[in-house]
Design a protein with these regions (language model features):
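Glycine/serine-rich phosphate-binding loop and adjoining beta1-alpha1 elements at the start
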Residues: 2, 8, 77-163, 286
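Generic hydrophobic/aromatic pocket-lining and core-packing "Φ" positions
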Residues: 23, 47, 82, 139, ...
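Glycine-rich phosphate/diphosphate-binding loop of Rossmann-like nucleotide-binding domains
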Residues: 6-42, 146-229
């Protein structure tokens, strides 16, 4: 089949849907791959690398979409690029919060964010792979912006205590952040409302708390050098850390929110007595790694939906993802 992908149109997106190595494997499977020129520029891959892997590089997005039967993207492209797609094509992307009423195209749509969270679907789970990078890069970002170092150090001049970190949410992002902060030398507490996640906290070397009330959460916030939120959210989710809790956060604490709602701050500005930064896409800070993982997810997905070089969308792992 003909597989195509174009440069991402979201201005802050650094990832690409395919790597040269995955392209090489797809070509070996009998597929044809067509890509827009400079598709991998922001993720560290050159057109010449793609060409050596068997890619056909085309000059425009329209050329790619006019040829491709299967279209792979990180995020859905703007309607101006999809208006001419046909029902014989399939568009595969992370549609996140975009509903069918807000996105109109004649092409079939496969929503990657709806991948079943089961062991048999792990190889195509872009949420898990990207969350892993998000947690690592978010923790690294926090450490970089701190006014102190993390580990306990004993010198002739003085003994430095280990930094104290609170991670809220035992999601994959939260677990990866906890693991990296621990390795960096922090004393880490992982908080989650589900007490069954205590073992997950232990697996990354963190203490565990199931704090849920105002008093319990504010007690956890006190004297922390790092606060990192990664709890699962929905559109109706309430903030876990509210403005009434801000006075309990000590000055110069680095506060990182990897969600839209975990912390009750609307603007992504640091005009508080602590340093605040919100980024739902920390994985974009490591685009080569994030792209490598995404592309391998797509390789496994294509092995499922086009095993004999023709489209088959009847697999139980795929049906929940169809729009």
């Amino acid at each position: 089949m003909i597989i195509g992908s174009i440069k991402e149109r979201e201005h802050s997106e650094t990832r690409a849907a395919l790597t040269p190595i995955v392209v090489q494997k797809l070509v070996a499977m009998g597929h044809t791959v067509v890509l827009e020129k400079h598709i991998g520029k922001l993720s560290g891959y050159t057109d010449s690398e793609y060409i050596k892997s068997g890619t056909q590089i085309l000059n425009s997005a329209q050329e790619v979409y006019s040829k491709a039967q299967i279209i792979l993207q990180i995020l859905p492209p703007p309607p101006s690029l999809t208006k001419n797609l046909t029902s014989k094509q399939i568009l595969i992307a992370d549609f996140n919060e975009i509903t069918s009423s807000k996105y109109s195209t004649k092409a079939k749509i496969l929503r990657l964010e709806r991948v079943p969270r089961t062991s048999v679907a792990q190889s195509i789970d872009i949420l898990s792979s990207q969350s892993t990078v998000r947690g690592y890069m978010g923790a690294l970002y926090a450490l970089y912006h701190a006014e102190r170092i993390a580990p306990q150090i004993m010198t002739a001049a003085a003994s430095l205590k280990a930094a104290s970190a609170l991670v809220v949410g035992a999601s994959l992002t939260g677990l990866q952040a906890s693991s990296y902060l621990k390795k960096a030398g922090c004393r880490v507490t992982l908080s989650d409302i589900n007490p069954q996640n205590k073992d997950l906290a232990a697996s990354v070397g963190a203490n565990f708390s199931s704090a849920s009330s105002f008093d319990e959460i504010t007690a956890l916030l006190k004297n922390k050098d790092f606060i990192f939120t990664a709890a699962s959210t929905s559109k109706k989710s309430l903030s876990i850390i509210t403005r009434e809790m801000f006075p309990f956060i000590k000055p110069h604490t680095v506060v990182i929110d990897t969600t839209a709602t975990n912390i009750d701050i609307k603007e992504n500005v640091s005009n508080h007595h602590f340093y605040f930064h919100r980024n739902r896409y920390f994985e974009r800070l490591a685009p080569q790694t994030a792209t490598e993982l995404w592309a391998n997810n797509m390789l496994h997905l294509l092995q499922i939906i086009s095993p004999e070089n023709h489209l088959n969308l009847t697999d139980n792992r795929i049906i929940p993802m169809l729009l």
